[in-house]
């Protein structure tokens, strides 16, 4: 028998071997032999690898994705005290106002929120580990330019129930907007301010959009800084003209319903929350992070005149019924910025302290040193230098060459 025959391994056996490897090692193996290169780019193997990694997630390394707002560099680091770099990817969208979201190893990018005259409605997906980039088909709502919309919103996430990545695009066209609502006028009411919104939903599996129209929507503005996608539902922070009225908007891709969730009344009284609302995934739900400075705390607060961080978790009590539970409330020392930079894989919030990072234990509420001297850049308390989120590896998009 020839030596070459001894070297040959059946494809099924190779799949069983390669599915156990991290993405970076799979890609290295794909460069060794042409047949392996083709194998790891098949949808069957990508699905096989993904399923195995999920089954062994409890023993696999945990990662964090650091998004540097200054350099637009994406760095994947190990979620441990050393926080060593695993890989990095620099991208240039030509604008500091680029919208960004990540879920299950893929990153969604868009410039549609840029107010420059040359409106760019493109939405793209990026796999930073595989260095693969996919431009999505134009959203059916891209016909509404920046000047033709009252507000727009994007969300991106992985829906494990259907094993699909989803983009939700919502537009409130000026042509359907209600007249200006004056909360102090006895002649105006929120019912008079109802308007129609257009909703586009993209599926990566089908590489297509569907369009939905919903009437009787009454949110005047949607925060575009941060969105959350959990269990097939997208969440944003919304505002009405009366600045004391803040809410969480959600779109359920299973039912195609756009709805609202009230936030605890006192949250909206803190000025900081109106400027920088922050919601993040929290297990199978979402958490609202309330950063309270000493100047906007109330006298009946336990930590009055002391900066503190509150975490409220959304509870789904029953169908169409939601409530909030305070998960944690901790005082923040003077040398720690109250701005949350992200969360670790265990849910502990990450905050900046000079050039280092600290976390707060969700069980003990005690601060812990996380990373020393992570960056040579000094921390500007008004502008976080990083946003940090849990990250998992994926081979998705590696097969796009086969589709083109």
Predicted regions and their residues:
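N-terminal entry/capping and adjacent linker segments that precede and initiate structured domains
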Residues: 1-404
């Amino acid at each position: 028998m020839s030596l070459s025959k001894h070297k040959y391994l059946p494809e099924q056996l190779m799949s069983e071997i390669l599915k156990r490897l991290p993405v970076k090692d799979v890609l290295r193996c794909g460069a060794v032999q042409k047949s392996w290169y083709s194998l790891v780019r098949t949808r069957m193997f990508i699905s096989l690898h993904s399923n195995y990694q999920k089954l062994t997630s409890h023993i696999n390394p945990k990662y964090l994705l650091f998004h540097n707002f200054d350099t637009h560099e994406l760095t994947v680091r190990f979620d441990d005290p050393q926080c060593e770099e695993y890989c990095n990817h620099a991208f240039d969208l030509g604008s500091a106002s680029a919208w960004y979201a990540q879920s299950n190893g893929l990153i969604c990018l868009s410039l549609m929120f840029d107010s420059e005259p040359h409106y760019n409605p493109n939405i793209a997906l990026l796999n930073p580990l595989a260095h693969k980039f996919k431009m999505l088909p134009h959203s059916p709502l891209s016909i509404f330019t920046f000047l033709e919309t009252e507000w727009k919103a994007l969300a991106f996430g992985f829906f494990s129930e259907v094993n699909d990545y989803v983009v939700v695009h919502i537009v409130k066209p000026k042509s359907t907007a209600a007249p200006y609502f004056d909360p102090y006028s006895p002649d105006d009411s929120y019912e008079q301010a109802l308007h129609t919104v257009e909703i586009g939903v993209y599926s990566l599996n089908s590489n297509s959009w569907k369009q939905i129209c919903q009437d009787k929507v009454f949110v005047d503005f949607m925060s575009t800084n941060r969105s959350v996608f959990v269990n097939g539902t997208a969440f944003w922070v919304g505002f009405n003209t009366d600045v004391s009225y803040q809410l969480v908007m959600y779109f359920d891709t299973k039912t195609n319903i756009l709805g609202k969730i009230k936030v605890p009344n006192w949250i909206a009284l803190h000025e900081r929350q109106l400027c920088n609302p922050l919601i993040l995934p929290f297990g199978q739900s979402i958490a609202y992070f309330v950063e309270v400075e000493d100047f906007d705390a109330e006298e009946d607060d336990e930590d009055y005149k002391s900066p503190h961080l509150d975490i409220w978790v959304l509870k789904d009590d029953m169908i169409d019924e939601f409530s909030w539970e305070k998960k944690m409330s901790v005082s923040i020392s003077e040398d720690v910025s109250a701005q949350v930079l992200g969360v670790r894989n265990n849910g502990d919030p990450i905050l900046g302290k000079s050039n280092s990072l600290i976390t707060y234990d969700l069980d003990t509420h005690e601060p812990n040193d996380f990373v020393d001297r992570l960056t040579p850049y000094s921390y500007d308390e008004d502008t976080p230098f990083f946003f940090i989120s849990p990250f998992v590896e994926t081979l998705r998009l590696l097969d796009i060459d086969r589709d083109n």
